[in-house]
Curated annotation (Swiss-Prot):
Keywords: Host-virus interaction. Homooligomer. Interacts with the replication-associated protein (REP). Interacts with host proliferating cell nuclear antigen (PCNA). Interacts with host retinoblastoma-related protein 1 (RBR1), and may thereby deregulate the host cell cycle. Oligomerization and interaction with PCNA are necessary for optimal replication enhancement. InterPro entries: Gemini_AL3. Belongs to the geminiviridae replication enhancer protein family. It comes from the Viruses. This is Replication enhancer protein. It holds the Pfam family Gemini_AL3. One of its GO terms (biological process) is viral process. Increases viral DNA accumulation. Enhances infectivity and symptom expression.
Protein backbone atom coordinates (compact mmCIF):
# COMPACT_ATOMS: atom_id res chain seq x y z
CA UNK A 1 0.00 0.00 0.00
CA UNK A 2 1.24 3.49 -0.79
CA UNK A 3 1.79 4.99 2.66
CA UNK A 4 1.23 8.54 1.40
CA UNK A 5 -2.12 8.11 -0.37
CA UNK A 6 -3.38 4.89 1.22
CA UNK A 7 -4.06 3.31 -2.17
CA UNK A 8 -3.14 -0.30 -2.85
CA UNK A 9 -0.26 -0.94 -5.23
CA UNK A 10 -1.23 -2.10 -8.68
CA UNK A 11 0.34 -5.14 -10.31
CA UNK A 12 2.09 -2.87 -12.80
CA UNK A 13 3.65 -0.79 -10.00
CA UNK A 14 4.89 -3.79 -8.03
CA UNK A 15 6.21 -5.68 -11.09
CA UNK A 16 7.81 -2.61 -12.72
CA UNK A 17 11.56 -3.18 -12.64
CA UNK A 18 14.95 -2.29 -14.06
CA UNK A 19 17.84 -4.48 -15.13
CA UNK A 20 20.23 -5.06 -12.26
CA UNK A 21 23.31 -4.10 -14.27
CA UNK A 22 21.96 -0.62 -15.11
CA UNK A 23 22.05 0.63 -11.49
CA UNK A 24 25.19 0.55 -9.34
CA UNK A 25 24.68 -0.45 -5.70
CA UNK A 26 20.88 -0.51 -6.03
CA UNK A 27 20.07 -1.52 -2.44
CA UNK A 28 21.18 -0.51 1.05
CA UNK A 29 21.03 -3.15 3.80
CA UNK A 30 21.09 -2.47 7.51
CA UNK A 31 20.22 -4.29 10.69
CA UNK A 32 18.19 -1.94 12.84
CA UNK A 33 17.69 -4.27 15.84
CA UNK A 34 19.14 -7.52 17.08
CA UNK A 35 17.60 -8.98 20.23
CA UNK A 36 19.70 -11.88 21.43
CA UNK A 37 17.65 -14.50 23.27
CA UNK A 38 14.84 -12.23 24.48
CA UNK A 39 13.13 -13.38 27.68
CA UNK A 40 15.61 -16.28 27.90
CA UNK A 41 14.09 -17.93 24.82
CA UNK A 42 16.17 -20.06 22.48
CA UNK A 43 15.94 -17.74 19.48
CA UNK A 44 17.07 -14.32 18.24
CA UNK A 45 14.97 -11.54 16.76
CA UNK A 46 16.70 -9.63 13.97
CA UNK A 47 15.21 -6.66 12.13
CA UNK A 48 16.63 -5.96 8.65
CA UNK A 49 15.83 -2.92 6.54
CA UNK A 50 16.40 -2.82 2.76
CA UNK A 51 16.31 0.61 1.11
CA UNK A 52 16.21 1.40 -2.60
CA UNK A 53 18.94 3.87 -3.60
CA UNK A 54 18.26 7.15 -5.42
CA UNK A 55 18.95 5.92 -8.95
CA UNK A 56 16.75 2.84 -8.53
CA UNK A 57 13.92 4.92 -7.05
CA UNK A 58 14.24 7.40 -9.91
CA UNK A 59 14.06 4.61 -12.52
CA UNK A 60 10.98 3.06 -10.87
CA UNK A 61 9.16 6.34 -10.14
CA UNK A 62 9.26 5.80 -6.39
CA UNK A 63 9.67 8.56 -3.80
CA UNK A 64 10.55 6.27 -0.89
CA UNK A 65 10.85 2.51 -0.49
CA UNK A 66 11.82 0.77 2.77
CA UNK A 67 11.30 -2.99 3.04
CA UNK A 68 11.64 -4.17 6.64
CA UNK A 69 11.69 -7.75 7.91
CA UNK A 70 11.55 -8.89 11.50
CA UNK A 71 13.07 -12.37 11.62
CA UNK A 72 12.74 -14.94 14.39
CA UNK A 73 15.58 -17.42 14.00
CA UNK A 74 17.08 -20.30 15.95
CA UNK A 75 20.51 -19.20 14.74
CA UNK A 76 22.61 -17.12 17.11
CA UNK A 77 24.80 -15.28 14.61
CA UNK A 78 26.95 -12.23 15.01
CA UNK A 79 25.11 -9.25 13.59
CA UNK A 80 27.71 -8.38 10.95
CA UNK A 81 28.07 -11.99 9.80
CA UNK A 82 24.30 -12.43 9.43
CA UNK A 83 24.05 -9.19 7.44
CA UNK A 84 26.92 -10.17 5.15
CA UNK A 85 25.41 -13.60 4.36
CA UNK A 86 21.89 -12.19 3.97
CA UNK A 87 23.05 -9.40 1.64
CA UNK A 88 25.15 -11.75 -0.50
CA UNK A 89 22.33 -14.29 -0.94
CA UNK A 90 19.75 -11.53 -1.57
CA UNK A 91 21.84 -9.89 -4.32
CA UNK A 92 22.73 -13.32 -5.76
CA UNK A 93 19.03 -14.18 -6.12
CA UNK A 94 18.23 -10.84 -7.77
CA UNK A 95 21.25 -11.20 -10.04
CA UNK A 96 19.95 -14.57 -11.25
CA UNK A 97 16.56 -12.98 -11.99
CA UNK A 98 18.23 -10.01 -13.70
CA UNK A 99 15.52 -7.49 -12.76
CA UNK A 100 14.99 -5.50 -9.57
CA UNK A 101 11.39 -4.71 -8.66
CA UNK A 102 9.38 -4.49 -5.45
CA UNK A 103 7.92 -7.98 -5.97
CA UNK A 104 11.30 -9.50 -6.80
CA UNK A 105 12.75 -8.04 -3.59
CA UNK A 106 9.93 -9.60 -1.57
CA UNK A 107 10.54 -12.92 -3.35
CA UNK A 108 14.24 -12.59 -2.52
CA UNK A 109 13.35 -12.15 1.17
CA UNK A 110 11.34 -15.37 1.09
CA UNK A 111 14.01 -17.28 -0.83
CA UNK A 112 16.88 -16.27 1.45
CA UNK A 113 15.03 -16.73 4.74
CA UNK A 114 13.23 -19.99 4.01
CA UNK A 115 15.33 -21.75 1.35
CA UNK A 116 18.90 -20.66 2.09
CA UNK A 117 19.10 -19.96 5.83
CA UNK A 118 18.21 -22.79 8.17
CA UNK A 119 16.51 -22.08 11.46
CA UNK A 120 14.04 -19.38 10.41
CA UNK A 121 11.00 -19.63 12.69
CA UNK A 122 8.86 -16.70 11.53
CA UNK A 123 9.09 -13.52 9.46
CA UNK A 124 7.04 -10.34 9.65
CA UNK A 125 7.41 -8.06 6.64
CA UNK A 126 6.57 -4.35 6.73
CA UNK A 127 6.81 -1.96 3.82
CA UNK A 128 6.97 1.82 3.62
CA UNK A 129 6.48 2.72 -0.04
CA UNK A 130 5.63 6.12 -1.51
CA UNK A 131 5.26 6.63 -5.25
CA UNK A 132 5.85 9.95 -6.98
CA UNK A 133 2.53 11.75 -7.30
CA UNK A 134 3.67 14.46 -9.68
Amino acid sequence: MDSRTGELLTAAQSENGVYIWTVKNPLYFKITKHHERPFLRNHDIITIQVQFNYNLRKALGIHKCFLTCQIWTRLHPQTSHFLRVFKYQFIKYLDRLGVISINNCIRAFSHVLYDVLNGTIDVIEKHDIKFNIY
